[in-house]
Amino acid sequence: MMGAAVATVISQAVSCIWVLRFLSGPKSILPLRRREARIYSYLLKDILSLGVVGFIMKFTNSLVQIACNKMLSIHGGDLYVGVMTVINAIRDVFTLPASGITDGARPVLSYNYGAGQMQRVRAGIRFMSAAAMVYTFCAWLFAMFQPRLLCRIFTPDEAMVEASVRMLRVYFAGFFFQSFQFCGQSVFQSLGWAKYAITFSLLRKVVIVVPLTLLLPAVGLGTTGVFLAEPISNIVGGLACYITMLCTAYKQMGRE
């Protein structure tokens, strides 16, 4: 484990150096210069208001993991803590393309919004939504019908594979609806509506997932209740975020 930790730190350091060299080199369109590295308060406020969304998402994910591991250790023991680790690894791999689609759409949406091209922004939202939904639906199908194949990638232990297969189907039951959350939050961040993005990030993780993670096992669902909290939050939080986006930002741009 020590070797893995050291390797992670080394990879992060190398990645940081590589990015800094590129951004300060001749190939960068806007190269970094030390003499121009100044802090402008009016820009800092906007940067922080949007950047805090990502921070909150990471922080709430950690909070959820703490709650999940605590409840699983009580109701299921080390086996189910390991199962959650396997499922989280699968989830991280599956969410990367969806995040890539929505994150990649942000500059396009922001540019056209700033240029006043509202119909292009609306078209971009539709395309992004369709692409993300098609992908998450295909990923959901794969997780439902080939869970054993996915679990074997991350563990050779048969007992853990069997437990992971059962819980993976529960955990991924609402994965398709996660695309609604990604798309809605991406639109809010692209338009600079940070308050909406923060609100729905907190809604899904802090208001829905954490309480359900603590409550469902206590009402007789045991370890299944811990994994069931995720699909419930995906459905409720995802639909709430996307419908709000359609009724506010998307509708407003249709009038302009």
Give a label for each model feature.
Residues 3, 61-65, 77, 99-103, ...:
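Functionally critical, cavity-lining and gating residues within the transmembrane helices
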Residues 72, 76, 113-114, 155, ...:
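Short helix-loop-helix connector
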Residues 38, 78, 87, 99, ...:
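Short, well-ordered coil↔helix boundary/capping segments
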Residues 209-217:
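Hydrophobic alpha-helical transmembrane segments in multi-pass integral membrane proteins
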Residues 8-15, 19, 23, 41-104, ...:
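Transmembrane helical elements of multi-pass membrane transporters/channels
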Residues 1-51, 109-174, 216-256:
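Short alpha-helical transmembrane segments in multi-pass integral membrane proteins
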Residues 69, 81-141, 145-147, 178-200:
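Small-residue-rich hydrophobic transmembrane alpha-helices
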Residues 9, 54-62, 74, 92, ...:
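Residue-level hotspots within the lipid-embedded alpha helices of multi-pass solute transporters
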